[in-house]
């Protein structure tokens, strides 16, 4: 048949991360869940303080303050103010970018694989 079908990309959840720690590191399930929860809580708290988070080989999370700016209602064309806000940005490391690029597109599955 030859046509590649696009499979739904998987989503890795916090619960699955904890399960992987349980399986690969040998922690018990409660410890694995606590580590995952604590890891993300520390990142969340650092960003809430306005700190950057740098994860070597993965990427950087930063908080940016966006100034107020004029916006436009697309339906009416009316100018509306957009308030100042803080946003989180993520910049992938070169190592992560290379890993993703070299992995190809795992969401593409051949007809033969899809039939299994």
From Swiss-Prot:
Keywords: DNA recombination, DNA-binding, Transcription, Transcription regulation, Translation regulation. Residues 58-80, 94-116 are annotated as: Disordered. InterPro entries: Hist_DNA-bd (IPR000119), Histone-like_DNA-bd_CS (IPR020816), IHF-like_DNA-bd_dom_sf (IPR010992), IHF_alpha (IPR005684). Pfam families: Bac_DNA_binding. GO terms for biological process: DNA recombination; positive regulation of metabolic process; regulation of DNA-templated transcription; regulation of translation. GO terms for molecular function: DNA binding; structural constituent of chromatin. One of its GO terms (cellular component) is cytosol. Residues 94-105 have a biased composition (Polar residues). It comes from the Bacteria. HAMAP family: IHF_alpha (MF_00380). Heterodimer of an alpha and a beta chain. This protein is one of the two subunits of integration host factor, a specific DNA-binding protein that functions in genetic recombination as well as in transcriptional and translational control. Belongs to the bacterial histone-like protein family. NCBIfam families: himA, PRK00285.1. This is Integration host factor subunit alpha. It comes from Bordetella avium (strain 197N).
């Amino acid at each position: 048949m030859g046509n590649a079908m696009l499979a739904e990309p998987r989503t890795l959840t916090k619960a699955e991360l904890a399960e992987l720690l349980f399986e690969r590191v040998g922690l018990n399930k409660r410890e694995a869940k606590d580590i995952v929860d604590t890891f993300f809580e520390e990142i969340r708290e650092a960003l809430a303080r306005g700190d950057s988070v740098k994860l070597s080989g993965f990427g950087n999370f930063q908080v940016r303050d966006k100034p107020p700016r004029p916006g436009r209602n697309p339906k009416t064309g009316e100018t509306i103010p957009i308030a100042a806000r803080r946003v989180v940005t993520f910049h992938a490391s070169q190592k992560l970018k290379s890993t993703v690029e070299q992995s190809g597109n795992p969401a593409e599955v051949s007809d033969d694989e899809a039939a299994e």
